Amino acid sequence: MSKKTIAVIGSGAAALSLAAAFPPSYEVTVITKKSVKNSNSVYAQGGIAAAYAKDDSIEAHLEDTLYAGCGHNNLAIVADVLHDGKMMVQSLLERGFPFDRNERGGVCLGREGAHSYNRIFHAGGDATGRLLIDYLLKRINSKIKLIENETAADLLIEDGRCIGVMTKDSKGRLKVRHADEVVLAAGGCGNLFLHHTNDLTVTGDGLSLAYRAGAELTDLEFTQFHPTLLVKNGVSYGLVSEAVRGEGGCLVDENGRRIMAERHPLGDLAPRDIVSRVIHEEMAKGNRVYIDFSAISDFETRFPTITAICEKAGIDIHSGKIPVAPGMHFLMGGVSVNRWGETTVPGLYAIGETACSGLHGANRLASNSLLEALVFGKRAAEHIIQKPVYNRQYQSGLETSVFYEVPDIEGHELQSKMTSHMSILREQSSLIELSIWLHTLPFQEVNVKDITIRQMELSHLWQTAKLMTFSALLREESRGAHFRTDFPHAEVSWQGRQIVHTKKGTKIRKNEGIWNNESFTAEKITESLFS
């Protein structure tokens, strides 16, 4: 029997979790745009959330996830992932993954925004993502191919099925890589905005490639802005993990006033969307916002990554304060997938931030993303292993009649427009203005043979921006990370409804899998928003 071939686009935690789950008999190729360590996962300062403590439970973790997600989560997916995630964390512990431990040898469990218990597993203080990638790279078998400096240029579709991927290397050479199954694990689209936490290679490629191939994209209006990026003189230097607030740090203005004290019952540990809006409001008044970490005695030991970021930015760590501002962090929406990571295109999977499974709802709970990456990576691999080998009689060769529409703008112009019109606060006239601008940009059609990687990335970002803006315009309510100043409350009429895009058009669809609890929608969500 011929070997089953798998092509994986991306090299973050989801991609490597998937690759590590295949036995040596599978022909797995991991393709990444730059170095294998160019991914958002490497930058993850938070940890992995799992209900491990004796007084904690999966039910409590589920409730926190639903509360943060503002009643837009797929309940079955949440329950599944949290159950499997706890077992995966247990497996990491048994295999000696270097989670932080106390002087007695017990695992240190941290607390982050919107969690009701200490359940965050960290490694290396604030270097969990980097250490997880190192660990997964050691776990994958030697027969797996890791191809660096090669970019996915198009998905190969034959008779409605994905049968491989066309790639372009750093020298501009095109290649065709046929596969029984293709897995998109290329991250989100943080580079659409001026201030973001993403690797520079994360430009919406997976979203746009899936859309071009005919797959469904869902929930693109739900873009999470992390409350605390270190921003100095308009320059963003990196993320300041909310674990700092979990350890006793607090948000203050230049006069030392605690800005979250009366804004939410959880104070500085309110859900990310809430904290981002409060900081945005303070900055709009002309107030500077800081994290005061003076109460954390061992800050440099506990947060070595953040300490290095402060040094790079010229921040005196002994001042006990870090200047912060919100920035784009995570896309809750993405390519529509089922519990196995299958998209609506046969032969095509999506996992990690590229995918939208319904786990995060309208706003992701802190440290649920690495959990998602580990669970869906392993789960997608297990599903692929169970499938029969595709009867391969490939007819698609090197197709050179593929064209990209490339807008005649610079990337920073698109970032500036998205930041001013589509970030934390949104309203109809501004969204319409942005949508018109996006759809009337002059562009050129560039053949895939001639296109540069940068042009390809700009095209992906432009396509994603158009769909994202249309979603934000259509959803006339505020829910989670999507906040409309002209519709400042969650609406029961939007409960369970999703905005779905395909090449054939856009539709609003009721998803019966979304947790339907009207009291949660009408009371808890609205109480957590401010107008």
Swiss-Prot record:
FAD binds at residues 11-14, 33, 40-47, 151-152, 205, 353, 369-370. Pathway: Cofactor biosynthesis; NAD(+) biosynthesis; iminoaspartate from L-aspartate (oxidase route): step 1/1. Binds 1 FAD per subunit. InterPro entries: FAD-dep_OxRdtase_2_FAD-bd, FAD/NAD-bd_sf, Fum_R/Succ_DH_flav-like_C_sf, Fum_Rdtase/Succ_DH_flav-like_C, NadB, Succ_DH/fumarate_Rdtase_cat_sf. GO terms for biological process: 'de novo' NAD biosynthetic process from L-aspartate. Induction: Expression is repressed in the presence of nicotinic acid. Pfam families: FAD_binding_2, Succ_DH_flav_C. The keyword Transmembrane does not apply. Its main location: cytoplasm. The active site is at R272. It catalyses: L-aspartate + O2 = iminosuccinate + H2O2; fumarate + L-aspartate = iminosuccinate + succinate. GO terms for cellular component: cytoplasm. The keyword Nucleotidyltransferase does not apply. Its cofactor is FAD. One of its GO terms (molecular function) is nucleotide binding. The record marks E112 as: Important in orienting the L-aspartate substrate. Belongs to the FAD-dependent oxidoreductase 2 family. NadB subfamily. Catalyzes the oxidation of L-aspartate to iminoaspartate, the first step in the de novo biosynthesis of NAD(+). Can use either oxygen or fumarate as electron acceptors, which allows the enzyme to be functional under aerobic and anaerobic conditions. Monomer. Homodimer. PANTHER family: L-ASPARTATE OXIDASE, L-ASPARTATE OXIDASE, CHLOROPLASTIC. This is L-aspartate oxidase.
